[in-house]
Amino acid sequence: MIGKSLDIGSSVIRFFSKNFYTLILFALVLISAFSSIWLFYFEIVKDTNPLSSIPAHIVKTLFDAMVLMSPFFVVKRRGFVFIPLILLDVFCLSAVWYYRNYLDIIPFSSFLLYENLTPLLLESAFASARWIDCLAIVPTLMTGVLYKFVLQKKVQKERRRLWWPVIVILSVFVCFHIFLSVRDIKSKQYDSLTDRFVTFPNNILYFDLNGMCGYILYHAATSLLPQPELTEEETIRIQNYLDAYPRYADNIYSVNENKNLILIIVESLNSWVIGKSFCGEEITPCLNRIVNDSNSITAVHVLPQVKDGRSSDGQFMFNTGLLPLKSGAVATRYDDVDYYSIAKALKRRNYTAVNMTVDGNNYWNQAEISVAYGYDRNIDRLGGGTSVTDSVLMERAIEKIKVQKTPFFYQLITGTSHKPYNEPYRKTKLSGATEFPEEVRNYMEVIHYTDRCIGAFVDSLRSNGLYDNTVIAIASDHNQLLSPCGVPGYNDTEAAFIVANAGVKYTHTSVMGQIDIYPTLLDVMNCNDYAWKGLGYSILRTPVGSAAGWNGTVYGNEGDSLASRQIEAWDISEKIITKTRWLN
């Protein structure tokens, strides 16, 4: 017995002596990986769930770092380990920046959207950086320097494949997670060993439960495995859900028969700015005039229901009446579906549908998805090769509209008011509102600019004799979280929906969802004979007082009679998009 113990001890000593510098490099790589994952945990998970156990996550993070870096032992060129290490750093850093803007983990599919890497997007990302983010950069840089100038030649002399450390690491990792599952079963938190890996409310809490490796494995599996066909039970459920919607085909706003429709989707428009003045300057004088007009619809308590697709998710809801995916962007994952849409509803009446954007066709896959929505033309890159300002968009739109055969439907997608807000955009008196943080003041300035562009556009419609025969709908693509502020009335969580020349005066004072915009527009445009009215409700017909987020949270009146259906709509929409292909 003693002899065997001595033999084992001698073997361990020989292993360490033969692989001394290799193990030093692995320790440095391990520290670097641990540092990046810990940044992810501390800035995202701990911020979301203050009750998350730090000691438990120290152990999880250590195991995750060891597993992710374990290929180090089986490649003879140890320097290759910097490839997964740098990829891990990039993911963790991107996730932290994404979270600071959108309060969620960036989906892996977003890294394939290289077309979205515009200077504006990069500037927005860098604006989210903080000094603590060095945790994802400095350790890797220091490890790289030490490897290059101190360890490389010594590690190369020890070059050999070592399988048993990998086997030990993976075995301990699996045993650790089995232990966690057994513990959860004993505490009656879950019923089976696999429950913790498939039952979770959101991505962040999934990471909290299962760590980085569990998170990566789960999303890899769900992305690569084929989507199952719609079952008979699911088909019946969808049909029963749709059958319970109000059925109507009457058009109560006949004054809008064959009127043109212009839908302006405003980047990052928070509704609290509407009607507000500071330092003697209105933030949104144009929108204020529309809101106060006797022929307009106003809703300033709109719940943003966008998910990973952000701006493209807003467009998706307004165009199709479906909710976005809970993971990934519809615009890039399901761009080949022939959706029912407002463009197709109008084209039955000989409308021409045109989409215009300040960005390129490749941004959020505009070229493909606009075809799926039924647009006849998609006009992009108005500046030749780069994004343009909102003023250029509006000027070019007027040029096109003046010679456009009527009736027409134009969708105009703005972009100047995109984050970051590092400096005032065309400074006005609003910059003197020192009761607000600098970021909020700069935000007010750029929204003021976009509002002026919309105002000039509306004035051009009037001067060209087009206004009276045109309905103008204005909707926020999503809200924009800004610096915390205690000024009364400040709210960066609600979006806006406004319709000028609507044929009716209506102010929706309670909460509604972005999903309710599509059926409301059908109502306004006298398209109620179109079979597909979406998964929302026209606020002109139904007393909507609530809306549901993707995680099942109800906003507004939680006891609203529609609340349970609004929650279920997310699952119904997901199945329609991913399983039925929803062919028109």
Name each model feature, range by range.
Residues 50, 55, 71, 84, ...:
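Proline-rich intrinsically disordered, low-complexity coils
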Residues 2-216:
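Transmembrane and membrane-interface helices of multi-pass
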Residues 236-584:
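Solvent-exposed soluble domains appended to multi-pass membrane proteins
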Residues 97-110, 127-130, 231-234, 311, ...:
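A diffuse structural propensity rather than consistent per-protein peaks
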Residues 5, 9, 16-17, 227, ...:
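Intrinsic-disorder-associated interaction segments
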Residues 215-240:
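Membrane-anchoring hydrophobic helices of lipid-metabolizing enzymes
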